[in-house]
């Protein structure tokens, strides 16, 4: 999965997919009542990027729905996975469940079109704080209460705080999650980060009894780092330059080992060599 980083304006969806992304990451900010408000990152963000592009969250969802609904004039067949980077740092811990409920209602209405031929992309809820694990239950309970448990099949999870792998496992246990787990590891492109924890996550994924199904590394903008991440066995790479990742995947060393995921590839299934 080539994951376009910080895609917060509707116009950027096309831009990143056209460069080779089959997945995008979108920031979601919340208001003081735990309502998802904007797709907005703000300053500081990554080196070489405009941090200030934004939409109202529900407007972005409608644009995203158009881009991921077959038959729509804006449809992009390649776009199959969306990571919502949930900026829950502005919330109190006791608002996490509420944030999950409100997020679910927004997605149900504006993205999934209340289950009536809505967007088809798989969705990952990425949470920066392990203490905010109740967000997951708030979200999943709401889908069930609203009569759409089938949409849980489209839903995956990520804790993005680079916490110890064992602590992340405990948070999922509390949240009642087993499966559909992506594990992120990374740091802003302005700084360097080694691959120690990525390798640990990959080992957990491949152990047969770990909690991780997929591992992605962020934010990778250079060819050398892309090669290192692929050599470590990641499933996804988040990038500001999808064309760079595409180029490396076309190199002789990687062409036979990796391919770009399509809609038919289940993002919740651990890949067995």
Curated annotation (Swiss-Prot):
Its main location: secreted. Binds 1 Mg(2+) ion per subunit. It comes from the Eukaryota. Keywords: Cytolysis, Dermonecrotic toxin, Disulfide bond, Hemolysis, Lipid degradation, Lipid metabolism, Lyase, Magnesium, Metal-binding, Secreted, Toxin. Gene3D superfamilies: Phosphatidylinositol (PI) phosphodiesterase (3.20.20.190). Expressed by the venom gland. This is Dermonecrotic toxin LhSicTox-alphaIA1iv. It comes from Loxosceles hirsuta.
